């Protein structure tokens, strides 16, 4: 199973940009992990989108999953129990969930270069050895640990 966390800044609201970015990233991943090919609909049975359920990138990720009939796993933050720490606790749970002996974990983070919550998710993903893609929608660049490329 491939667990793909789609997360990011709450002010990110460009679905078309998210979709285009995900297609580009999945094309790169297809060669290495055989999860998808050029046509995203070709093989999605071994993939799940993981969402923190926040507005912005998380919600757009769920919209993407619905459009392509991809299974989802939701991790809403428990603000009533954990207060201001809820988002950080939720991020940790998602990162740990995405990587098991039976799954490959991937993070696609849509970041403005400022959001502390998104930076926290990126740091957790790297700490937990998830394949990490950071889409800086302000500079139109996608970065992973091996390369830097443009969305457009």
Write out the residue ranges for each language-model feature:
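Acidic/glycine-enriched connector segments
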Residues: 3, 12-152
């Amino acid at each position: 199973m491939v667990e793909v966390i789609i997360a990011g800044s709450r002010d990110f609201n460009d679905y078309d940009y998210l979709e285009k970015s995900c297609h580009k990233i999945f094309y790169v991943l297809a060669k290495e992990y055989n999860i998808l090919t050029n046509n995203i609909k070709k093989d999605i049975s071994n993939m799940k989108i993981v969402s923190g359920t926040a507005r912005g990138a998380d919600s757009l990720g769920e919209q993407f999953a619905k459009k392509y009939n991809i299974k989802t796993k939701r991790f809403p933050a428990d603000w009533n129990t954990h207060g201001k720490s809820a988002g950080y606790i939720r991020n940790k749970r998602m990162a740990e969930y995405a990587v098991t002996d039976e799954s490959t974990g991937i993070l696609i983070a849509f970041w403005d270069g400022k959001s502390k919550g998104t930076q926290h998710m990126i740091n957790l993903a790297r700490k937990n050895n998830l394949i990490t893609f950071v889409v800086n929608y302000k500079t139109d660049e996608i970065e992973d640990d091996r390369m830097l490329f443009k969305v457009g």
